[in-house]
Amino acid sequence: MPNQHTLLLFNLLPVGSNISTWWNFGSMLLTCSALQVMTGFFLAIHYTANINLAFSSIVHITRDVPYGWIMQNLHAIGASMFFICIYIHIARGLYYGSYLNKNVWLSGTTLLIILMATAFFGYVLPWGQMSFWAATVITNLLTAVPYIGTALTTWLWGGFSINDPTLTRFFALHFILPFAIISMSSIHIMLLHTEGSSNPLGTNSDIDKIPFHPYHSHKDILMLTIMITTMFTIMSFSPDIFNDPENFSKANPLVTPQHIKPEWYFLFAYGILRSIPNKLGGTVALVLSVAILMTMPFTHTSYIRSMAFRPIMQLVFWTLIATFITITWAATKPVEPPFTIIGQTTSFLYFSFFIMNPLVGWLENKISFHS
């Protein structure tokens, strides 16, 4: 045993033989995480967390630092890839009932919240127009907290408006939170491996397991190759595809952009926020849009784990996916008809999924098992 090749030690990890490509996104997320830490480290070496120098330091990285443009673009595109993978990973969990493994699901949802915070802080760092105004709008939501809201906001800003102390602390937070992500990921993976992966059938895999290596290791490598190739292709041909044109202008507190909007991966939550015409209500809905995922293990009523054998729930699930895409699209549009009503309808449908989950489960049990 002591002389065994490291990969061969994965022979000790038995995995269900029928897990599909949807189970590959965990390893892809791990790779994204490693890539973000590496590129982020090289960017942090040259970045200056000062409101007068931050924007120039990004320009300096892109133009003057050897291969700085690769680091900067990979870090930006890597963030989008991270979110694409995590949303697919969550959708897989919802579809195949992976959330019934409570500890794994709750640690994963916590990971998502930390990741979203990290990405938000990172978006502020270039100190472009959209960075500044997105930070202003989102941090301002804290004032909606009863009694302590104003004090909380002033404390977060480090002053009475977004200024140099805010940028400095956001850089510090953006630097330290990835370590929290790495720690939580380790916990997430350890909790997963106490019970093992679920599978598309939602059955117990114990009767039919194969070694992780070479079968699943090669399967993972294929998807990783596709992901990295996609990233480098985007970086080479259209590196600014995910960027907002406003963010190429330095932050100016005196000029408000026409449409303040966050990066695409926050648009669904932003769409829900702005579909409620009340500050506190919108803030609560914004937090709930992610936190509501935590209710899934406790509202599962069906006798069947996977949606593969639940046609009514499949309809509800694909409605959720369509809703998610529609909110994302509607949130890029100005606040005027018909976009306001589209945003409100899709927000209602988004939350309806989590209410329908126990009801449809109960209905399916009635149809399938009590006829």
From Swiss-Prot:
Membrane-spanning residues: 25-45, 69-90, 105-125, 170-190, 218-238, 280-300, 312-332, 339-358
Molecular function terms, GO-annotated: metal ion binding; ubiquinol-cytochrome-c reductase activity
Subcellular location: Mitochondrion inner membrane
Membrane topology: Multi-pass membrane protein
Keyword Transmembrane tagged: yes
Protein's GO biological process: mitochondrial electron transport, ubiquinol to cytochrome c
Note: Heme 1 (or BL or b562) is low-potential and absorbs at about 562 nm, and heme 2 (or BH or b566) is high-potential and absorbs at about 566 nm.
List of residues binding heme b b562: H75, H174
Identification of the protein by name: Cytochrome b
Record's keyword terms, sorted: Electron transport, Heme, Iron, Membrane, Metal-binding, Mitochondrion, Mitochondrion inner membrane, Respiratory chain, Transmembrane, Transmembrane helix, Transport, Ubiquinone
Binding residues for a ubiquinone: H193
A GO CC term assigned to this protein in UniProt: mitochondrial inner membrane
Residues annotated to bind heme b b566: H89, H188
Purpose: Component of the ubiquinol-cytochrome c reductase complex (complex III or cytochrome b-c1 complex) that is part of the mitochondrial respiratory chain. The b-c1 complex mediates electron transfer from ubiquinol to cytochrome c. Contributes to the generation of a proton gradient across the mitochondrial membrane that is then used for ATP synthesis.
Subunit-level organization: The cytochrome bc1 complex contains 3 respiratory subunits (MT-CYB, CYC1 and UQCRFS1), 2 core proteins (UQCRC1 and UQCRC2) and probably 6 low-molecular weight proteins.
